[in-house]
Amino acid sequence: MHSFDELIQRSTAFSLQALEKAQGEVLDALQTSSATPLVKALQMIQLQKAISAVGMFSMFDAMLRDDLACSDGFRRAGELLEERNNVELKDRFMSFQLAINVLKHGRGRSYDTLVQKAGGLPFRITLTDEAFFAEGDVSEVATLIEVDDEFVRNCANVITEVAMALRNVAANGLE
């Protein structure tokens, strides 16, 4: 694999820094005005984080398909990780994969699987009886997964770890 994992780290840091700067400017403006466009700007910033997370996973899937010469890059990567007894990484990767599916498709099998594991996930998911992550937070957008800076960074981190593990598999001729 080429340096996608390095680029995704840099891209994520750059994007989050730019979004943090924009959010700071909007929050400053909200000190003197509660105009709807300012609230919408906060929501747009939150939505952009979700778009970044979904996009990085989609691009990683395409790379895996090419590099592993398969039709389901995520499944093959999981198999290779499991074959090398890297089950913790495989499980974490799968949790983020499922979260991305929930962001893309909403409630369904992926959501149901995550709800069953809600207490042990490295991110928050709204449960069936919850409407918000933080009631009164005007920046919150309707996603079933809480997509904050940590979630986006963790997406980039798990992609990097999986890419490095797969490079080690390929380097050792263990494919």
Indicate residue ranges for each PLM-predicted region.
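Extended intrinsically disordered or low-complexity regions, especially N/C-terminal cytosolic tails and loops
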Residues: 1-55, 87-91, 98, 115-175
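Charged/polar positions within long, soluble alpha-helices
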Residues: 20, 61-72, 98-115, 164, ...
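Short, contiguous, well-structured surface segments enriched in hydrophobic/aromatic residues
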Residues: 43-77
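Short, mixed-charge amphipathic alpha-helical segments
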Residues: 76-118
